[in-house]
């Protein structure tokens, strides 16, 4: 290709960020599969160059189309078959490439090589998702979020397929189809999309007490994260680590975001679902493109094998968590996401995660939900990705070579040489051969766990307590978080048509968790509260469960809207942007229209969004610079006033400099730490920074109920 075309290619093609050293071995492997059409001739799938891609071959200008038109037939046929089955759950997702870096040598716990060397980096591909809705549903619905990480280790792929909540709705995989059928849109009318606020879901969970703990998480702020980078992640199940000596410990996996754990408010989440249904996807993409890489730390809760029976819950029960006050989280590494995919379908849509993708040193427990997942994930890929060769798809291929006697099937890419496709064989020298277990690069050896018992269908008695940890979660929340949980239950149950379902949820589930919770919800949904039948649990709160204790302590990655109009004080704009940039935060200029804005000093400012196109729900705070004419224009426009009032109602910091301080009086905003006033942007910034660090101004929440929506 010519030098000119090479230059065109570098300027016009690709979605990568500029080179920031963000390549890795997996991305280098994918390079062989990347296609770039810049400067190339249009051709058929078989390489024949196309002279006319505008017209079907016809008999005369106005005559019938001819069947011999192989170009049209190939194009239409391919188009007709472009869609593949979407995931049954977790269909709506977004993903990114990155790396995991180990902090220390964990050889005392596991022989997994990617955890056995301090500083060792392992490529990863991470997919975040919602659960209930289809591919086209909104990002900000109330739902569990999937948090799946594929480690491309030297010893094979390890998939940590988790969620942003540490527990699940059911204890046994046999109930998974029932749960999913219940939460999905109802079969008679395919309503609702991306929501659990309907009869079949609440019918199921009100009849399934084991779901009580997880539903409490679902009704909490954890179900409406502000961004993927602000989510915790959990492996959900208890796994097993095995070292080279064959010694085992039990482990819970945790991802802790460096950006802090925080969420939207419910009204904000609903508005974002309409105004920017791609909000979480867009934020992840844009942050990576501008080099503001999301980062998490990996933590382990390690439980010695001989202590697994020392808790008042069963470690094999996926509806239970291990409180950090009982078993502290040991931070062992970090994960950085630093590159976006080149093609959504080829990477994000075709990636295949599976809890059974493990490497030597990581093993399973007898968690009955985990055991069922070990079957389900492979089974579902056979349909979704058209057969058993899904591991040959580039995004799924391991970095290490793989050799076995699996053969043929649809879309086979490997060209196997030799005559023997079985083992043992003598024709090909017995290859490929088994690898004995070893401290490094050995074969996988299942942990020798003693097992005994009769064949039966029964839950262990240790799985029977369904309300203690739901109560633990409730009592660990702040007053604001508890109010949000009550509001969420009330909203969801108000959508339930059958009074009997509402009554059962309140009187048979919530009343067994906490009488005050049940009473507050009952009053909102028209249910007569029953007398408590049993004493309710009174657990000691776990501070680690409240998001109020999980903020980052800085304002990195926060986004501030700067409202501008003609006559704005340009110095306030530049000073605040500079101050935010130094803290790792970002700001965008938002104006009445996309036309350039003339500052009071004659400078021309280019808006990066409009009041209608980038509403306040897209930002963490709003700042209005000084400038008499600009402030008057904003105060005379209902859209500008709504922008500020909506941000205030959503408990966000709103800051005013110079002449713009009059807007706070015009809107009758009561004084609180989030209403920041100052003569200049420099005066405003310390208070704005402090308010941003708190995420939201929770003490304002009660007062905002008087503000019309």
Swiss-Prot record:
Q: What class of enzyme is it?
A: oxidoreductase
Which compartments is it annotated to reside in? Cytoplasm
Q: Does the keyword Transmembrane helix apply?
A: no
List the GO terms this entry assigns under cellular component, sorted alphabetically.
Answer: cytosol
- Which reaction does this chain catalyze? 2 H2O2 = O2 + 2 H2O
- Oxidoreductase is among the record's keywords: yes
> Superkingdom of the source?
Bacteria
Q: Where is composition skewed (Polar residues) in this entry?
A: 1-26
Q: Which residues form the active site?
A: 90, 163
Q: Where is this region: Disordered?
A: 1-32, 419-443
According to its UniProt record, where is this protein mainly located?
A: cytoplasm
One Pfam family hit: Catalase
What the entry lists under InterPro entries is as follows: Catalase, Catalase_AS, Catalase_clade2, Catalase_clade2_helical, Catalase_core, Catalase_haem_BS, Catalase_immune_responsive, Catalase_large_C
- EC numbers listed for it are 1.11.1.6
Query: Which cofactors are required for activity?
Result: heme
**GO MF terms held by the record:** catalase activity; heme binding; metal ion binding
Give me the residues that bind heme, please.
Answer: 377
Q: What are the protein's UniProt keywords?
A: Cytoplasm, Heme, Hydrogen peroxide, Iron, Metal-binding, Oxidoreductase, Peroxidase
Q: Which NCBIfam families match?
A: PRK11249.1
Which family does the UniProt entry place this protein in? Belongs to the catalase family. HPII subfamily.
Job description of the protein:
Decomposes hydrogen peroxide into water and oxygen; serves to protect cells from the toxic effects of hydrogen peroxide.
The protein's name: Catalase HPII
Q: Which organism is it from?
A: Pseudomonas aeruginosa (strain ATCC 15692 / DSM 22644 / CIP 104116 / JCM 14847 / LMG 12228 / 1C / PRS 101 / PAO1)
């Amino acid at each position: 290709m010519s030098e000119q075309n090479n230059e065109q290619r570098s300027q016009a093609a690709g979605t990568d960020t500029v080179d920031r050293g963000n390549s890795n071995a997996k991305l280098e492997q994918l390079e062989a599969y990347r296609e770039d059409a810049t400067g190339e001739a249009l051709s058929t799938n078989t390489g024949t160059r196309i002279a006319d891609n505008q017209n079907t071959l016809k008999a005369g200008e106005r005559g019938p189309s001819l069947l011999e038109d192989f170009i049209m037939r190939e194009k239409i046929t391919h188009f007709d078959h472009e869609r593949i089955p979407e995931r049954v759950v977790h269909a709506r997702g977004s993903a990114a490439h990155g790396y995991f870096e180990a902090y220390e040598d964990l050889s005392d716990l596991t022989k997994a090589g990617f955890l056995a060397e301090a500083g060792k980096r392992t490529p990863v591909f991470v997919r975040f998702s919602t659960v209930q809705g289809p591919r086209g549903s909104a990002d900000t619905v109330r739902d569990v979020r999937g948090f799946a990480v594929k480690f491309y280790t030297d010893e094979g792929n390890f998939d940590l397929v988790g969620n942003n909540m540490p527990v699940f709705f059911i204890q046994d995989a046999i109930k998974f189809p029932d749960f999913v059928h219940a939460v999905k849109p109802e079969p008679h009318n395919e309503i609702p999309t991306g929501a659990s606020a309907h009869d079949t879901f609440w019918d199921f969970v009100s009849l399934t007490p084991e779901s009580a703990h997880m539903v409490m998480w679902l009704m909490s702020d954890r179900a409406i994260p502000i961004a993927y980078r602000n989510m915790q992640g959990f492996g959900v199940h208890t796994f097993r680590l095995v070292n080279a000596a064959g010694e085992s410990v039990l482990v819970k996996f945790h991802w802790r975001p460096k950006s802090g754990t925080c969420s939207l408010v419910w009204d904000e989440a609903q508005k974002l679902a309409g105004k920017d249904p791609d909000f979480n996807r867009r934020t992840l993409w844009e942050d990576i493109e501008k080099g503001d890489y999301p980062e998490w730390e990996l933590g382990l809760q390690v439980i010695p094998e001989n202590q697994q029976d020392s808790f008042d819950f069963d470690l094999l029960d996926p509806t239970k968590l291990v409180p950090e006050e009982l078993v502290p989280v040991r931070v062992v590494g970090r994960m950085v996401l630093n590159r976006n995919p080149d093609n959504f379908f080829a990477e994000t849509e075709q990636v295949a995660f599976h809890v059974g993708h493990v490497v030597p040193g990581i093993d399973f427990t007898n968690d009955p939900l985990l055991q069922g997942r070990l079957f389900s994930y492979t089974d579902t890929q056979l349909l979704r990705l058209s057969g058993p060769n899904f591991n040959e798809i580039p995004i799924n291929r391991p970095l290490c070579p793989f050799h076995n006697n699996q053969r043929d099937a649809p879309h086979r890419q490997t060209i196997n040489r030799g005559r023997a496709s079985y083992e043992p064989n003598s024709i090909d020298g017995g290859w490929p051969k088994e690898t004995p277990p070893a401290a490094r690069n050995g074969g996988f050896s299942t942990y020798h766990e003693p097992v005994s018992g009769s064949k039966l269908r029964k839950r262990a008695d240790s799985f029977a307590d369904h309300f203690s940890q739901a109560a633990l979660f409730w009592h660990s929340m702040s007053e604001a978080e508890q109010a949000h949980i009550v509001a969420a239950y009330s909203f969801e149950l108000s959508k339930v048509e059958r009074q009997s379902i509402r009554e059962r949820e309140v009187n048979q589930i919530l009343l067994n968790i906490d009488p005050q919770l049940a009473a507050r919800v009952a009053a909102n949904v028209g249910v007569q509260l029953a007398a408590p039948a049993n004493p309710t649990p009174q657990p000691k709160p776990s501070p680690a469960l409240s998001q109020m204790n999980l903020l980052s302590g800085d304002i990195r990655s926060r986004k501030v809207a700067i409202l501008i109009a003609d006559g704005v004080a340009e110095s306030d704009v530049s000073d605040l942007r500079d101050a935010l940039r130094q803290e790792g935060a970002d700001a965008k200029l938002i104006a009445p229209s996309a036309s350039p804005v003339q500052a009071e000093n004659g400078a021309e400012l280019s808006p990066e969004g409009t009041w209608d196109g980038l509403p306040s729900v897209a930002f963490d705070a709003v700042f209005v610079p000084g400038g008499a004419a600009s402030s008057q224009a904003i105060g005379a426009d209902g859209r500008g006033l709504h922008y500020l009032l909506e941000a205030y109602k959503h408990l966000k910091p709103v800051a005013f400099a110079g002449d713009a301080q009059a807007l706070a009086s015009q809107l009758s905003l009561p004084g609180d730490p989030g209403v920041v006033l100052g003569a200049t942007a420099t005066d405003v910034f310390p208070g704005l920074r402090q308010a941003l660090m708190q995420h939201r101004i929770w003490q304002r929440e009660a007062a905002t109920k008087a503000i019309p929506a």
